[in-house]
Amino acid sequence: MLFKNEDSGNGVYCFTYNNFSDVTISDILNIRNDNKNNDNEDNKQDDEEKNDEDDNKSNLLLEENEENKRQGDKPFEDLSLFSFKNNEQCYDNIKMQQAILNSSYEKNVKNIVKIVYHEDCKLLYENTDIHVELPSIVYGRNRNKNNDVVNKCNQYNDDDYTNKCNQYNDDDYTNKCNQYNDDDYTNKCNQYNDNDYTNKCNQYNDNDYTNKCNQYNDVRKITNLKYFINHNWKNINLINEKLFLKNLKELEEILNYNFLHICKNKCKQYNKKRKNERHFSYHDNFLSHYIIYKKNKFIKHNKNEHINGNHYDAHESTNTYDEEKTREKHNNKNNNMKYCLNKYPYDNVNAPLNLSCPWYEKKIENIYCLNIPGYKYKYKYICPSMSKMNDEKIKELYIPKGHILFNSKFESGNLKYVIKEENDKEVYSLFLNPDIRMNEKKNQWFYFSASYVPNEYYTNELYKMKMCNKDINHIGDNMNVVYNYMNGTGNNINNIVNNLDSTVNYMNSTGNNINNIVNNLDSTVNYMNSTGNNINNIVNNLDSTVNYMNSTGNNINNIVNNLDSTVNYMNSTGNYLNRKNNNHLSYTNWSGQRCMNQYLNDINNDEIDTNLDGNRKYSLDACDKFTVRNVRKLEKPFTVRFKIENMAKPFFLYKYGHSPLSFSECKYKIENIQWERNSYDIKYIKNSSCKHYNIKKNSMEYYNYNTYTLEFSYDFTYAYDTVYFASSYPYTYSYLSEYLCLIRNLLKDHPTINYIEERLCKTSCGFDCPVLCITNYDRMEEYNKEELKESVEKKQNIVEANNTCDEKLVDGMDISSNAIRKEIKKKGYILTSKKLDKNRVVNNLFVDMKNGCTRGCASGCTNGCANGYTNGYTNRYTKGCTKGCTNEYSNDNMCKECLDIKNICYQEEKEKCDIIKYNDDKDYSHNCCYEECYNMKREKKKFVCCLSDKCNSFLNEQIKRRRSIMGWNILRNRIKCCKNKMYTSNDFMKTFDSLLKKVYVCKGENKKNNGTKIIKRFEEKYDNNLLFKRKDEKRSLSASPKKKKKKKKKIIVLTARVHPGETNSSYAIHGFIAFIISNNIYAHILREKFIFIIIPMLNIDGVILGNNRYCYNGFDLNRQWSNPIGYIHPTIYSAKLLMKNISENNKIIFFCDFHSHSRKYNCFIFGNEGSYNYVKNKKMCEVFPEIYSHTLPWFALVDTVYKADNENKGSARLISGKEFSLDCSYTFEISLFGIQIRKDFNIMYDEKKDIFYVQNYFEGYQNGDDNIKGGDNIKGGDNIKGDDNINGDDNIKGGDNIKGDDNIKRDDNFQRDDNFQRDDNFQRGDNFHRGDNFHRDDIYDKMNKHYINNNYYYDKNSYDFLYFDENLLFMTGVSFGICLFKFINFLSYHKSSICRRTCEEKEKEHISTETCGILCAKNNKDDEEKCNESKKQNHDAFKTGNSLEFDKGEEHLLSDTHRMVNTFLCNSMNKSKNKNKNKKGYNYILNKYGFIKLKSSKKHIEEVKRIRKLKKKKYMVKEVYELGRKIKQNKYYHNYPFGLYKVNINDVIRILNKINMDDPNGKYKGPGFNNSVDMKKKIKNKNESKTEKKSKTENKSKSKSKNKSKSKNKSKRKKVIVIL
């Protein structure tokens, strides 16, 4: 559906000029040149006067031409009267006037104002109905209002003129000329074929042009631009295809190797108690090794200073810094840091995974995405109503002769216009195109290109030919003179032709006379003999007439040729050059560059595509493409300063000097350098006033809102180079479609992966929104006995293998017989020995790779497997791989210790006995995911990895070797056990198309029932949406019959790119898709148990148009999930409808929406505050982020926030969590810039700490094993055992809780971040004592020093910074998939501890958390014990914000976590720094602001109920709610619903205490407070007498003495818990 644009209509317009006023843009912007001198000004004035004279001359010529138009053909009548003798003079006049015109044009070009800007043009995108505005480059001044000149000049392309010129090729004239075959006439005719004109045309045949092929910067024109673009796009697709296959290969090798190592280490620890399951924590952390390698490489690369160009400002690179001193200090403290890369500090792991080898790091580094910019352009369609419009009406726009020319016509480009400052410096002010229907003219995403064109281009022959060509738009308005003169010459030609016809007729008459004379010669022979002399005279006269005719004809030909040379000179020479040098042109040797010297370039001249509707397609190309051979590097870089003046966000990481991205075409094709950040002098400044140039009004407009300017400099190092600039890595819709096409071809007819790609919906612009559904095919449900017996017979040769295996065994299989060898060759099994002749096998496949892989192994791996992938993926996924691997595996240089993909070859046929379990006695209900797939021996020294059968294909199960043959009864019983655990998905995949159909429309909620119908629908199936059942339900089901053998797979939904400017999210989902479709063990296990539904791009329209946040209709799609409209928000509506249809029969257990963040570093997650299920008294929604923090080194757990319901209303995370009862509903945020990591970071980490902002316990490891043992266990004295971990959840005897995330200071001063600093040794009573060797200052060295406004800024003294690139973003998506595996693994292991809590339990949970904030004194041990007990029971105790730290301070301190207290109490407390404050002082502060301290927690619920009964509570609750919105606090603790508002109960009590002034202590008296009589009694009058007061007090004292017991009960009810 089309929506009218506010700025323009829906009609499609041709490209027209706008009427500009005489005021230049430089006057409007008040641009001044500070470097002007008086002498220069005088010189410039003289130049301006000369230029004005030239302009006046050109204007006079234009006026004369206009008069000539009005008079018609009168000025050409004189030319028609020219005689044949004056034709040469006519030709000379043409040359003279053309020279004058060229000279005047060259002067006028120099005098063009140095301002380049863009104007909007309307167009339609290809195959859509969208109406788009795009910028176009125009001149600064001296333009005509209309483009009639261009249209009239194009008339010479018609056939009328060519036919007139070709009239003289008829046979009549040629026959007449050929009648005279005498040698005299032929010689005379051939005189005009001399080398005079041919040499002029054949000048390009000389060696001058051929020599130029070897010159630098050889510019050549592209004749077939359409073929050139398509050819380049095909080459890019081939590169992406090879990269895609290589990424899958490298990814499979890394993940399979990692998984097998973990299984080996896990096998060695079966005999030990798995109390904490440490293999979960150390699982899959190979990226920790890689980040150190990446960081060191980045620092070495950035130590070199930037290339010195013609800088005009002093430059200090913000990205480079010297950190050698800080690193030396850190290494001196930690002498054992160098060993950290080779070994884990984990004593139980005897053979750790060594991932610091160079080959491993290079394999990870080679995995990346490549999106080459600038090869997809936007198209224009002429509407059917305008199909009658001639091609001549398409206007062409003018561009000046400048050094920098801009373009944004490619996909996702959003440049509006550019203004060049009027000085000698290359400084450009850029204005971005805002989002459609956006009120504010600003943007945050930018993507444009700038081309550097040297001066030599304008003196080049190609440019000269262009000036003589029909491209009169380069000549400007002065070409009117040429047009008028050409009309005059055309009339002269017509007159000459008419005269020629008269001469021809005269010749015919003379010829007839000659024939009559010849006929009479026979009769008058005798007479002619007498008069022979007279005939000779006549013949001579006849020859003279013929010669005269030939001369006139040649003159005509010369005139025609000269006219053609002026009009079509470039076409003729270009065709000649193409004919002459076809053999020299090859696209492979080109460095194809672009220069924006032409706006409209119709690449479909020969073939115009016509649709059924009659629409004619034209390509909009913002540049005049040409190729450049032998591009030369500049001796001195050409520096340009860019200023983007309408940036939107006030806080952006550009403030810290981070550079935008740039992509140079020359560097990519010559140096193979892709996107890089090499800009410098970066500034991000707030503008004093917001300005925007309105091209329609030709004036600068000023607005009230704020905008910001991003300034940066760039050095062009190559001539004719085109550089693309972007705020983040661009990821276009076309690149996504090509990527999905590669996946379709790869997974076509795949034996195991069930891949479906469907269209979710059509977007508003008419594009297809893809949705992916990925899982594995179901296993066979029934097994034949015969097949099982055959499989058992095949296992007869299986024997038990120890660490040392027999020489004649292939991984536990006997290969001595020839029959088994033939079977091995048929099925593609690979021997680990070098040659098949040698019956020796290397059985230890998991030897640590100390020296890495040798050259032969690396080369064989890359060559052999790459060939196998390319040849075998289309037909059979694994066939080619086995062939390629077998050919290369026989290489003598193969490294034995390298576990490669060759050792994990894939079997073509699946065997049915592969799902057998071998432990009948063991209960698998609470087993881990990889335990189900790998059933290994419990013995320490008996481990064998099977490379046969399914382990050889998918490594899903480990079949043990036994000497005895398994019987059929044992096998049958184990198959029954396996059948109960099967998961099905084929039915779901078959009906997936029906789920996408729009059966009904989501309507709004009913006002009467407040949406109870919709809620009721989900309540009916509420239990089905739960991840796990309750404990009571499990007990009740114990006596019930067994469940069905089939289990439906659960659903995981992932979405991305709802905001177009957040491109990093697309790269992350790109990496996850590559992970889930690859043939690695993690992905295979996930596909076996889950169905993945992925929507990789939700806002396709905004991505194509270059928007930052909004869609085509001007809506933020991430705020429309609550009530989407099908025809306005089609993608959101269809996605939500799909999830609702799925939830009817299946379970959605996980949802994540990928986003990007512009104000923070690293990666983090936003989750929902409420949670339904709990794991070990911990919310299930908090488990996944913690697991992710241990796997991904650049994940910041500190920035992970669980937001409330009233924040980000309508977001996908919130709505999916509410409506589908999802605990795990997240928003995954990735920084747009990079990673900020501490300099002391290493691969060691603590399970309960964040590795980025809290230092590890590794520093205590330097002083020996007495203080620290076991990595995470601390032994500081005899009273604390090594198994007691120090964290927020565990209690230490005789002391308080020690939290790893909280920092402690000794100064006894309360700080905002709940941090305390201690300079002495850390002591906790008599039970806990830490030695002097363990320094707390080294461990917690000002952790929160750099915390400002919830953002961590870049401090190069404490942190290292690393930019995100395609490699890191890709691996972020891969690690997300690994964390999903670990998360499911964790839940499957702790399945018995998962429970669901009701609303009452949640209220009790809130109450228990409140006890953590009770104000406790030092000597009050009862309160401390209660607080510790509440921390044990509640999972919220491990948070830093909810816990209260206790110190040696004499008085209790208030916490600043409460959002209403910190503004009042903290200020007053900071003023009073005396240590000896009494409790009365703090109680006075509490009573002053209406806070009461409660002792019992049960009264809290009673007070909530009592407040809800109040009749006039609305006003007070509303006041509290509005006050909370003004403060804008992100954390909301202990909120309770009161009517329509959800507020903090303590805030309500504070308001009630202010109203109730009767009680001196500031307490209110319950529900009786609403009575009007009581209210009147409570109001005190200042004018009351003292006697009345005394009488009242006496009466009160009597009543109090009688009812003491009653007053005590009432006072207990009045007290309320203060939640801090």
Curated annotation (Swiss-Prot):
Topology relative to the membrane: Single-pass type I membrane protein
Class in the EC hierarchy, top level: hydrolase
Chief site of localization: membrane
Biased composition, class Basic and acidic residues, residue ranges: 33-43, 1581-1597
Ranges facing Extracellular side: 1-1367
Organism superkingdom: Eukaryota
Transmembrane segments: 1368-1388
Chain positions covered by the region annotation Disordered: 32-74, 309-328, 1279-1329, 1560-1620
Residues annotated as domain Peptidase M14: 1004-1261
Biased composition annotated in UniProt, kind: Basic residues: 1598-1620
GO CC annotations, alphabetized: cytoplasm; membrane; microtubule cytoskeleton
Cofactor(s) listed in the protein's UniProt record: Zn(2+)
Region ranges (Possible malaria epitope): 497-559
Assigned EC number: 3.4.17.-
Keywords: Carboxypeptidase, Glycoprotein, Hydrolase, Membrane, Merozoite, Metal-binding, Metalloprotease, Protease, Transmembrane, Transmembrane helix, Zinc
Keyword Metal-binding: yes
Entry-linked PANTHER family: CYTOSOLIC CARBOXYPEPTIDASE, CYTOSOLIC CARBOXYPEPTIDASE 1
Protein family according to the UniProt entry: Belongs to the peptidase M14 family.
Designated name of the protein: Putative zinc carboxypeptidase
Organism: Plasmodium falciparum (isolate 3D7)
